[in-house]
Amino acid sequence: MSKHTERIVFFIRQKLQLPALYVRAAALLLLALLLLRHRTAAAAGVVSGIHTCLGTLIPSLFPFILLACLCTNSRAAQVLFRPLSPVMRHVFRLPACAAPAVLLGLTAGYPTGAKITANLYAAGKLTREQAARLLCFCTAPGYAFAAAYTGSLLLRSDRIGLNLFFACALAPLLLGLILSRFAEKPEKSLKSPEAAPGGIVSAVQDGIKATVSLCGFVLVFSMLLAVLHDAGIFQFLCGFLSRFGYTVPLSGALLTMGLEITAGVTQCIYWHLPVYFLAFGLGFSGVCIHLQIFSFFHKAGLPLSKTRYVLARFLNGLLSAAFYLLLSYFLPANTSVAVETSPLNTAPMAGSAASSLALITLSVFFLLTCILRSGKTPSKICGGNSTGKMLQ
């Protein structure tokens, strides 16, 4: 880039900073007015968020967050995952220490994999490029949320829950496999595993801090959703989307899932929307989960391109929906599902198995096109630049 071009870019950035500051100030003022005007709804939203944290989030997530912290501090955990070293090195082109992030991230649920990735980067075991690439395919709802909670408990169908779980696990694996084709194979480490001092104590402390942080984000988004509903802003947005052909239930469910996945799943089931919308939402994971992941990497000192990460999550959501359609075609759900969920289970699908394969192919083609245009650097999609550094 020439000096003249750099001056033009710098001038444009300087001119855009002031309007952006005014927009943020206006948004802060609007938020303050909404909280003062609808303080009762805000309090009710906080209470609802507390019930979600105490009844669902903490019991189901804290054990895996603790396990994630132990996996990065314990020598025994590194030995346990050593058999996966060839797979990580030759298939995903990552060091062996990344195995817990992939395995636990796909099975234990978000944001376990992101937490392990942030810990590995903070410990110097992953480069910036490796951490950025790993982050793109180590985040999934896990078995407890996708299969047990959404499938068995809410939908009362074990088969649908398993299809959701495997769809949300296969999608990030495909992304990781594609991104690894454009990365260099890491050198084989000859060092023996090292254990951090005070592994168990520090793991418990880190697990508690991470869980409290996650609960804080859930409370904030639960409060915001309640305020938006009470102020009529949420209904206005649903009506606006309905002008583009979206039904009001679909608009509300998509908006809710885009913000907070737990409430979004409930909305989808309440309005009896097709299950592939659930698969998309579980694959995308929602802004609440995204902010939780951003907080991990901010503490680890790793700048992250938020726009590119959200784009990767959107592609992951599309692939999850396509994989669910494919799995439900070959492994259809049992017909003996509860009557309450029958409209959801029998809702018309978006297409056949052929259309699902077409959607997967188009998503892969789009991802490959983005990678090739960015100079064959997978971290461009995840948040890094050609030198392995992340973009702000």
Task: Tell where the protein language model's regions lie, with residue ranges.
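Transmembrane helical segments that form the transport core of multi-pass membrane transport proteins
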Residues: 76, 204, 208-282
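Alpha-helical membrane segments and immediately flanking helix-loop junctions
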Residues: 91-155, 254-270, 276-301, 309-314
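C-terminal transmembrane helix pair
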Residues: 126-133, 144-145, 173, 275-370
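Alpha-helical transmembrane segments in multi-pass membrane proteins
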Residues: 55, 60, 64, 68, ...
